[in-house]
Structure formats: structure tokens, C-alpha cells
Amino acid sequence: MIKVGIVGSTGYTGAELVRLLTRHPHVELVGLTSRSYVGEHYWRVYPHLKNYTDLQCEELDLPRLVDRADVLFTALPHGHSMDVAREVLSRGKKLVDLGADFRFRDQAVYESWYRVPHTAAELLPRAVYGLPEINREALRGADLVANPGCYPTASILGLAPLLAKGLIDPGEIVIDAKSGVSGAGRGFSLKTHFAETNENFQAYNVGVHRHTPEIEEQLGRLAGRDLTVAFTPHLVPMVRGILATIYTRPAVLPDRDELYELYADYYREEPFVRVLPPGMLPQTKAVAGTNHCDLAVVPDPRTGRVIVLSAIDNLMKGASGQAVQNLNLIFGLDETTGLVFPGLYP
């Protein structure tokens, strides 16, 4: 059994990790840390997990937790995983970080967007960006994995076939994305207060969202050149889900069937990417609670654009589900282990 500890287990991504790992056939949970619920049984914090784990939340004692675990997940705010990573790797163990601390090759990019010093910059070259669909081989056996952000996951999967084939202008990409409120985390804030969010639809962090450079770095790798995207996120009154609508400009506009075949062929062997046939469009409810990404690609002859639509569950393929997929790859398991189930509908 793979012994797993979770640092920061009582946020939404931590809870989703616990939900997935309690039913994973090759995992034993050995520690769940929390600053807010020390001594509480985990199921008292999240009652839906009663009878699935009897672990109590514990204060972080990193050396002791590392001794017990083969791998740690960190589900912490940015800036808090650096010291954890250094300790874990120095002890010969593995780390999957669900935060942003190891997603960038360039320390200066991280520091300019996240406004904190990177105190473990020597580990950045060692980190593997954890999007299996573009980085699978590098993830096998990796000891430090930077789990992607939710918006980048939806955006990169939506654009990868077009950029890999060189069919679109890399300087003409517009990403318009909508997310449910769980993406903001479990902490209380006016922005996610029921009375502020219900029956409301709002843009936020226009032009300055911290996922922008992450999207640009990974799309630039696919395109083979630096690029800039226009990215605008929106908050919508639902709990889970991201829907990204992506506008691109090709040199020559393919027809509907050509685009479908391009995407279907590119993702043919991918267990969690579903390319919808012409006439069907992604919807967040169809992926809720699953590790799937649903894609559709549509030509717009009137404007000469190719429009891509990408839907994921921000807590699953956008966070914890993808982290478990990465865990499976790290330890040489079938990457779908513990992740094959339909979502809830309606």
C-alpha cells in the first residue's frame, strides 16, 4: 500500500482528496493535517465521509508525518509548500503540490505574479508539471509534481491539439472562463457570500489573474514559442465546474468534421478527455464529480475563428482528481485507478 499524508486536508481540495483516496485500492491514508480542526475526527468536519475514515485532524509535525508517509499532498495557499517540499525531498519521499509554488520554471515569473519570495527556487527545475495529457512520461516516477491550476487545465486541454499542429495564430487566443464558487476555497469572504453570489454573474481579476502566466507558459511549450493570451475569469452561482470558451484564429479555417477528427485523434488514448461529436456542447453538470474534461470544437465561418469549449469539475480534473491521476503515474499504477465512475446527474 502507498502511505499518503495530506497537508491542509480540510479545505475543499483536501476534502476531495480524502474522498478519492479512502476508496483507492492501493492507498492507506496515514495523516490529515489541519490548522483549524486539530483533534477533531475528520468525518465531523465533513460528515459525508463518516464510515470512510476514522482519522483525526492533526497539527502539522512535518518530520513525523514524513516518517509515516511515502508521499505527501500539499493543499495549501501559495507560498506555504516550499519548506514542506524541501523537507520531503531531503528525506527521499515524494510530494504532489496542489498549490502554485512549483508550477513555473522561472522564479521571477512566480514572484511577480504571486508577490511572495520563492524560498525553494533550487527545486523548480526538479518539479514536473502535472498535466498527464501533455507530460505523462515525465510524471512516471517523479518525486515533485506541480499539480496544475483549474483554469489552466481546462484551457490547455482545449487548445493543445490546435497548437501542437500549428493550426492557429498563437498571438490570437482569447479565453473566457466561468467557475463555480468552490474554486475560491472554503474560507469566508464577501465575494462568495450567498447573498452576493446567488443570482449573480461577475468577472473578476480581469487581466491580472494569477493563472494567466501558467496558461501562457504551458501553451508556449506546445506552440514552440512565447505567447500571450487574453484571459478573463468569471464567477457563476454554482458550486462546482468550469466552462472555458476559447476563441482562436486559424490561418485556414477547417470544417466541422476536420476539427472533430483532429481532436478525436489527438485524445484517442486519453482516458479522461471526452471529445464530443459535432452538434454536442460541453456542460458542467456532465462532468461534475468526475475526472473528465469534455471538449467541443466549432468553426465559425462568419468570423474565421475556431471556437473551443472545455468543461471540467474544478475540484476534480481541476485539482484533486488530477492529483490522484498523478499519484498513479508516479507509482506505476494504471492512471485511472480510483477515478473511474460517472458523475451525479441531475
Swiss-Prot record:
It is found in: Cytoplasm. This is N-acetyl-gamma-glutamyl-phosphate reductase. The lineage of its organism: Bacteria, Bacillati, Bacillota, Clostridia, Thermoanaerobacterales. Transmembrane segments: none annotated. PANTHER family: N-ACETYL-GAMMA-GLUTAMYL-PHOSPHATE REDUCTASE, CHLOROPLASTIC-RELATED, N-ACETYL-GAMMA-GLUTAMYL-PHOSPHATE REDUCTASE, CHLOROPLASTIC-RELATED-RELATED. One of its GO terms (molecular function) is NAD binding. Pfam families: Semialdhyde_dh (PF01118), Semialdhyde_dhC_1 (PF22698). The gene is argC. It comes from Desulforudis audaxviator (strain MP104C). GO terms for biological process: L-arginine biosynthetic process. Belongs to the NAGSA dehydrogenase family. Type 1 subfamily.
